[in-house]
């Protein structure tokens, strides 16, 4: 039985004791992503790939050694970024990672992390998509918050 579309969108929200600019910089810099990845899925990403706009593509290496090209599909500096991962040279198979930041004040930010696989049709990826939980998203958020707070927020 296929899940309903609402079951294919998983999200978690939390407040972080850091400014939105600092948090966003850690998300938009792919080389920082492995340090806060709560899924333990990312091994590395080369420096110098800071996302600046929709259409950018950044590469990450997964813990299993595979490379992913991440196609940026939503971008508002400091407040929203989303990308669709794909195998090199291929079209994204239909899942998306999104981060949205809402400043509460200069040192407190509400952050929402979403995994959306409503458009995923690749049967080889469905089990992995189904296994992604809000707790996994929260783990990434907790690690990101620690890094942002430690660096002066």
PLM features: residue spans?
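Hydrophobic-ligand-binding modules of eukaryotic lipid transfer/binding families
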Residues: 1-15, 94, 104, 135-138, ...
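Hydrophobic ligand-binding cavity/cleft-lining segments
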Residues: 1-49
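Short, hydrophobic/aromatic-enriched beta-strand segments in well-ordered soluble domains
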Residues: 14, 112-113
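Hydrophobic-ligand binding "helix-grip"
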Residues: 34-35, 61-110, 116-118, 146
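A conserved amphipathic terminal alpha-helix motif
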Residues: 116-153
């Amino acid at each position: 039985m296929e899940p309903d579309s609402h079951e294919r969108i998983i999200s978690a929200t939390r407040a972080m004791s850091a400014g939105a600019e600092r948090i966003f910089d850690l998300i938009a810099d792919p080389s920082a992503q492995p340090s806060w990845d709560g899924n333990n899925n990312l091994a590395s990403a080369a420096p110098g790939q800071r996302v600046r706009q929709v259409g950018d593509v950044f590469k990450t290496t997964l813990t299993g050694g595979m490379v992913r090209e991440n196609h940026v599909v939503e971008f508002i500096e400091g407040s929203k970024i989303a990308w669709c991962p794909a195998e090199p040279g291929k079209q994204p198979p239909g899942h998306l990672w999104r981060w949205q930041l809402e400043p509460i004040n200069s040192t407190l930010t509400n952050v929402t992390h979403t995994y959306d696989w409503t458009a995923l049709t690749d049967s080889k990826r469905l089990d992995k998509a189904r296994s992604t939980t809000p707790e996994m998203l929260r783990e990434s958020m907790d690690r990101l918050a620690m890094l942002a707070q430690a660096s002066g927020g």
